[in-house]
Amino acid sequence: MEMKKIACGVLFAAASMTAVMAAEEVGAPAPGPASAASAALPALGSLVGASLVSLFSYYLH
């Protein structure tokens, strides 16, 4: 069971690093948001990220 937790942690870390390394850099700045609806998008992303981390920690516990 302990090896399963370690393997899951390593796999999660590798997937996170792969996602970060795959991000392409954009030379030109992005245009500003056209409406206030896009302002809530970062809050939604952090909520999803917190939920995934919570689920991952619950799985390892």
Swiss-Prot record:
GO cellular component: plasma membrane; side of membrane
Induction (record text): Up-regulated by AHL16/TEK.
Membrane topology listed for this record: Lipid-anchor; GPI-anchor
4-hydroxyproline PTM sites in chain numbering: P29, P31, P33
KW Membrane (keyword) present: yes
Signal peptide residues on this chain, from the entry's feature table: 1-22
UniProt PTM comment: Contains 4-hydroxyproline; hydroxylated on Pro-29, Pro-31 and Pro-33. O-glycosylated on hydroxyprolines; noncontiguous hydroxylproline residues are glycosylated with arabinogalactan.
Residue positions assigned to the propeptide: 36-61
Matches recorded under InterPro entries: AGP23/40
Localization annotation: Cell membrane
The entry's keywords: Cell membrane, Glycoprotein, GPI-anchor, Hydroxylation, Lipoprotein, Membrane, Proteoglycan, Signal
Lipidated sites in chain (GPI-anchor amidated serine): S35
Positions of glycan attachment: P29, P31, P33
Tissue-specific expression: Expressed in pollen grains.
The family this protein is said to belong to: Belongs to the AG-peptide AGP family.
Function: Proteoglycan that seems to be implicated in diverse developmental roles such as differentiation, cell-cell recognition, embryogenesis and programmed cell death.
Protein's UniProt name: Arabinogalactan protein 23
Source organism: Arabidopsis thaliana
UniProt gene name: AGP23
